């Protein structure tokens, strides 16, 4: 049994070997949608919605290792002040975020040869930079917002174990 840490909550997940139909690995060894290989993923990941923002953020990086693009998923890995960072676009919507987060977790924690969870869990630091709406009238448009977590009201979490814990946030 593996434990997924999401928003400070420990969610138990039961995974054995992941079937080819459940997680597609491209012929080049990359994750199907985001086209990243496990060794290309840094421990620090910056997510942006708009693919055009990847190059803007990457402008602050040195030692760029690659730039991939597949549909709305654009990625690059480089260094900022000596720290390795991956920048990746998600596109719009919770469906895309779900795809990206699932594939990032697989890149970090699944052995792509055996399709089984790795014995040692790798934790990623993920920072999302982008636009958002606010439900508080006292937050003016254009204000910087720093959140600890977000919860969608679209029903996506109904497909995950631990949804009852998350619904009480």
Where are these regions (language model features)?
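N-terminal amphipathic/basic-hydrophobic helices that include classical n-h-c signal peptides
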Residues: 1-15
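Metabolite-binding pocket within alpha/beta catalytic cores that recognizes anionic/polar moieties
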Residues: 15-169
């Amino acid at each position: 049994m593996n434990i997924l840490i999401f928003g400070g909550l420990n969610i138990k997940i039961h995974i054995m070997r992941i079937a080819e139909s459940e997680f597609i690995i491209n012929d080049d060894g990359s994750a199907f949608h985001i086209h990243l290989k496990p060794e290309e993923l840094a421990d620090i990941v910056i997510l942006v919605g708009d693919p055009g923002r990847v190059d803007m953020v990457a402008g602050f990086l040195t030692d760029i290792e690659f730039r991939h693009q597949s549909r709305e998923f654009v990625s690059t890995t480089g260094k900022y002040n000596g720290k390795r960072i991956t920048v990746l676009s998600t596109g719009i919507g919770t469906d895309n975020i779900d795809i990206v987060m699932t594939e990032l977790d697989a890149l970090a924690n699944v052995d792509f040869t055996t399709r089984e969870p790795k014995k040692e869990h790798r934790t990623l630091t993920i920072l999302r930079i982008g636009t958002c709406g606010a439900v508080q009238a006292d937050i003016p448009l254009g204000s910087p917002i720093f959140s600890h977590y977000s919860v969608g009201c679209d029903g996506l979490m109904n497909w995950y174990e631990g949804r009852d814990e998350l619904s009480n946030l």
